[in-house]
Amino acid sequence: MKKIQTLAMVMGLMVATANVAPAQGIGISTGGDEAGISMDAGGKKKKKKKSSKKKATASKVGKAVGKLKTFNGKPSKKALVYVYLQSASWCGPCNQEMPEVASVYQEMAKDGRAELVLIGCDQTEDGAKKFLKQYKAKFPGVLSTAKNVDKLPGFTAAQGIPNAIMVDAEGNVLANGFPSAVLSQWKQKVEELEAAAAEGDADNEE
């Protein structure tokens, strides 16, 4: 009888021990709070750090070209260099320049650091579109009479066409003249701007 009582007591103790919850908790994420809260192994609340990454913002010129109602695509808002090309389908010298302009733009678009926008001097948008299509030009365009063209930083209406104005992202004029001559400088100007920016960052760290 004593052996049976002893065995019953041992079994009861084992059952009671099995029903006790472990001391350490399991990680839980609430998911409802923007910052986020989780539970560590000891059951304490631990706040998740918010990301400190800032979204890249458009430059002064980037914002301005973004307001244009362009055809043949949308201009980049984050280029380092912009070229305003004033040209028209009825202009002989403009037609002579267009094959080279279209070719150079392919390099610019592939690189991603420079953008070109046609400021078309045709009377109609259809005329300007056909002009671009004729030379398989992939850059965006807008008529010179369109809204907000006169507000483009660094832009001035040329007395004669074709004409190209190259500006940095803040609208400072880097070059102004015949398109082929201006476009031949785009990569050099981009590299100069990048070098100046890197030098400025180095000075700020000192």
Question: Language model features by range: what are they?
Answer:
Residues 112-127, 137-147:
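Thiol-based oxidoreductase modules, predominantly thioredoxin-like and allied folds used
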